[in-house]
Regions:
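Residue-level signature of catalytic and energy-coupling elements of molecular machines
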Residues: 33, 39, 71, 94-96, ...
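Conserved structured catalytic cores and adjacent interaction surfaces
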Residues: 21-38, 101, 124-136, 142-155, ...
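Interdomain boundary/hinge elements
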Residues: 56-58, 173-193, 233-244, 280-293, ...
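P-loop NTPase switch module centered on the Walker A-proximal segment
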Residues: 2-121, 125, 161, 165, ...
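A short, contiguous, amphipathic alpha-helix enriched in charged residues
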Residues: 352-376, 590, 594
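Conserved nucleotide-binding/hydrolysis modules and their immediate coupling elements
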Residues: 242-345, 355-359, 369, 392, ...
Length: 648
């Protein structure tokens, strides 16, 4: 990647002799679950951001319901930590970016706002693929890095090895970046290392023993390292205003709020500025409200200067990447660029016979489209495209997780939807079909090596590296088509009995790898509507695993279970027992039935086969056939077969 074509290169920032020593803008980047949000909590507590007697909430920056539930950060958020130094107070603006590559658009936006990066790595797991993704973006932007080895008090910590692995990763990534001179390379590799335990709220510059606690009372060594190694923002405080919109938010009182970094000049409440849009047009607008961040809250301010991260209101249609400039002398800043989507799925209104009965109040195409348009405003890494049907849209994103999170958020908001199976977004390069590939990193007990190898061979995976810690666990690196990862998680957890860890990150576009069969079982499909009977389920118990319980309503074409054989089976699950004068307790009947397999949204999307989709409602997630009528399905299958034979 040429260092010139970076996200928000340091070359785009004002190069003047003037700096703001009272400011530091830092992003914390790490892999999912390496303790990033916990570290920010500890930094806030030790800077006195919470009142002594205030009730402390863990992981305060994960404010979204889904974020707390899944333990991952989805949106890039910022907080301001005030720190007293010998030279006076310093405000450290911390951007908490997602550690998951699926939310990469958030990572790129975060990097456009900062002058340095804290790379947080788990003392046992070391740098993982997602760390690689974020670090590559950081190096492209030419930002200095501070390495924080977190969780050093883990019993399985291997601190020295992890530091060495991080250095190797940096060297490897530096090789990918063109025109990087030796001085820049030396600076990058001589990065400072801080050893920390975020949960204990301690950090040290001296390496503790593996599993030991850092030898200081607090996080002061981390704060001092940040102030020394992250440069104060270079600013042009006397020049004309130039500010870049890096994120959006909404408020019930103020409407749309734009989060901006001021690169030059000053911004005042009530000021009229030039709003420079993506289409090249410029419009004069008034800043109705100016807000600055103090700890986790935004407070009104009258004025903000160059180098600061602030929020503004008063421009209803402003979007990410726009520039706010001086009216007399408008000059646009380079827009934020994000990687193209790799996975797509269709999202439309609920078209099943149970539509409107799933506890949702948002069931029309107009509402679905309005919600998807709203998502586009704040989420730069997704695209919404029309399909042949007026009530269905194709949504493209970075990965399966990002799209599943969007659908889950809509479900909780009261939407009833029909969601198609995730597909890959292909490209034609030099006349040949190319598809996205992913780099997959696996950590698993050694005894599952054979099963994992077999699983990935069937998904066109190519092993690139294999190693072990000498602890009975192995580390594998694979490169495989993104298609091969759709539905992979469930199979992988089954094969490793829940003990394996798998993480993946986008690698690039390569030639189409051929057919991949990710599911080797069929579906049990209801052939008529009605309530499920225990009698029918007992008669059909040997046919496979059920997803439903007696008494629930089904409709024709609904998938009620999994057939171990590789074909679909239409069954009558509503059949009633012929009445006799023999009596049987219903409790006895229930005991003979196996417990049904419950699937959440992600599992249902993974289970889906090509001719199936998922019905999503606030109180239910069901897999169903796209074509509900069994006869119509049979005709479509015959048509496909004859088409394949003709092509062959």
């Amino acid at each position: 990647v040429p260092a010139a074509s970076v996200i928000a290169s340091r070359a785009d920032r004002p190069i003047t002799g003037e700096t703001r020593p009272d400011l530091r803008n830092v992003a914390i980047v790490a892999h999912v679950d390496h303790g990033k949000t916990t570290l920010v909590d500890a930094m806030l507590r030790q800077s006195g951001a919470f009142a002594e007697r205030a009730e402390l909430v863990d992981r305060v920056m994960d404010s979204g319901e889904l974020e707390r539930e899944k333990g991952i950060t989805i949106l890039a958020k910022n907080t301001a930590i005030r720190r007293q130094t010998e030279d006076g107070p310093v405000t450290i603006n911390v951007i908490d970016t997602p550690g998951h590559a699926d939310f990469g658009g958030e990572v790129e936006r975060g990097l456009a706002m900062v002058d340095g990066v804290v790379l947080l790595v788990d003392a046992s797991e070391g740098p993982l693929p997602q760390t690689r993704f974020v670090l590559r973006k950081t190096l492209q932007a030419g930002l200095p890095v501070v390495l924080v080895v977190n969780k050093v008090d883990r019993p399985d910590a291997r601190i020295a090895e992890v530091v060495e692995e991080t250095h190797d990763l940096l060297l490897d990534l530096a090789g990918d970046i063109e025109d990087m001179d030796d001085a820049a390379l030396d600076t990058m590799l001589s990065l400072p290392v801080v050893y920390a335990s975020a949960r204990a709220g301690k950090a040290s510059l001296t390496q503790p023993a593996d599993g030991g606690v850092p030898d200081s009372e607090n996080l002061d060594p981390l704060f001092e390292t940040l102030l020394t190694h992250v440069p104060a923002p270079h600013v042009d405080s006397t020049g004309p205003l130039r500010a870049l919109v890096t994120n959006l938010d909404a408020s019930n009182f103020l409407g749309r709020i734009a989060l901006i970094r001021i690169h030059a000049g000053k911004l005042r409440k009530g000021q009229t500025v030039a709003w420079m849009r993506e289409d090249g047009t410029t419009q004069s607008v008034r800043i109705s409200e100016l807000l600055v961040t103090e700890a986790l809250t935004r407070v009104p301010a009258q004025e903000a200067g160059a180098g600061e991260l602030v929020a503004i209101a008063g421009i209803p249609d402003i979007t990410i990447g726009d520039t706010l400039a001086d009216l007399e002398n408008p000059e646009a800043l380079p827009r934020i660029t994000v990687d193209q989507p790799a996975i797509s799925m269709t999202i439309g209104v609920n078209t099943s016979p149970m539509a409107g009965r799933g506890g949702g109040d948002k069931v029309t195409a107009r509402l679905v489209k309005a919600r998807l348009d709203q998502e586009l405003i704040g989420n730069v890494s997704i695209k919404v495209l029309p399909t042949e049907r007026p009530d269905t849209w194709e949504v493209q994103g970075r990965g399966e997780l990002a799209l599943a999170i969007l659908v889950e958020q809509m479900r909780r908001e009261g939407f009833e939807l029909t969601v198609g199976k995730p597909q890959v977004v292909t490209r034609t390069i030099d006349g040949k079909l190319h598809e996205p590939f992913e780099r997959l990193s696996i950590d698993s007990p050694e005894e599952h090596l054979g099963a994992i190898t077999q699983l990935l061979a069937s998904r066109k995976g190519r092993m690139e590296h294999m190693g072990g810690h000498g602890t009975g666990r192995i580390k594998l690196d694979y490169v495989l088509p993104a298609r091969g990862l759709i539905g992979f998680r469930t199979d992988f957890l089954t094969e490793t009995r829940g003990t394996g860890i798998a993480n993946h990150v986008f690698e690039g576009y390569f030639p189409w790898a051929g057919e991949i069969r990710t599911r080797h079982s069929g579906s049990l499909v209801a052939d008529r509507s009605g309530p499920i009977t225990a009698y029918a389920m007992i008669q059909l118990a040997d046919r496979g695993t059920f997803f439903v319980e007696p008494g629930a309503e089904v409709y024709e074409g609904m998938v009620v279970g999994e057939n171990p054989r590789a074909e679909d089976l239409d069954i009558n699950i509503t059949k009633e027992k012929k009445l006799t004068n023999m009596r049987q307790s219903s409790a006895d009947v229930m005991e003979t039935l196996a417990r049904p397999r419950k699937m959440d949204l992600e599992e249902a999307l993974e289970f889906c086969s090509v001719d199936e989709c998922v019905e999503v409602a606030p109180n239910a997630v069901r897999v169903r056939k796209t074509i509900l009528d069994a006869n119509a399905r049979g005709k479509e299958r015959s048509k496909m077969k004859s088409r394949d034979n003709a092509a062959g």
